[in-house]
Each structure stands twice: as structure tokens, then as C-alpha cells.
Amino acid sequence: MKEFIINRLKKFTIEDLMRCILGLQEIEIRVYFDLLENGEGSVLEIAERVNRDRTTVQKALRSLMNCGLVDRRKVTEKVGYKYIYNAVDLDRVSDIIEELLDDWYQNVKKWLTYFRENRK
């Protein structure tokens, strides 16, 4: 069993970790990597690059901002303003995932201790 799990973990990609640990959907991962590879962009620019509609990209960006994977800044235009989005680097994503895994590990250890002490 242990060997099976270790072999599966060796095949994990950063996308798998983002899906599993951060709970991201495919479109959110796609938007993140689009920003990482192509640089910053507005909702409409990103939507065009990932071939999805504006509202889908807006939802993905909101989710990515909530996870700390995307930042935005407000740009004033002749008529109104727009937001420009930028992906944080992969080192920061790794830090976020590591922090979440550490928290999860500590919680599982507490739960197992509780389970052992209270199973009778």
C-alpha cells in the first residue's frame, strides 16, 4: 500500500496539487498558467487567450485571487477603469500549498490522537 501511494505521488504535477490541495477547477488552473506564461491581462484579454467567455474568466480570477494566486491593479482609462490581473510566481504557489499541507498534517495527527483515545 505504501509503495503504491509513493508511486502515485511521484507522478503528481503542480496542476494536480493545485486541483487537490487548493480545490481549483480546470479553468482556474488554465487561467493561472495563461497569466504566468503570457503576462498580465484584462478579463477580456485573458478570455480571448483561453477561449472562454468573460463571466467564466471573471469567476476563475475571483477564485484565484481568493487563493492568493492572482493579484490585480486598477487602471484608469478615458472612460472608466479596468482591472489588470497578474499571476504570482510558482514559488509563492508552492509556499501556499506547503502551508496548507502542514496545517492539514497537523489536523490529521490531532484527529488520529483523538480517535485512538476515544475509540473505546
From Swiss-Prot:
It comes from the Archaea. Gene3D superfamilies: Winged helix-like DNA-binding domain superfamily/Winged helix DNA-binding domain. InterPro entries: ArsR-like_HTH (IPR011991), TrmB-like (IPR051797), Tscrpt_reg_TrmB_N (IPR002831), WH-like_DNA-bd_sf (IPR036388), WH_DNA-bd_sf (IPR036390). It holds the Pfam family TrmB. To M.jannaschii MJ1503. This is Uncharacterized protein MJ1082.
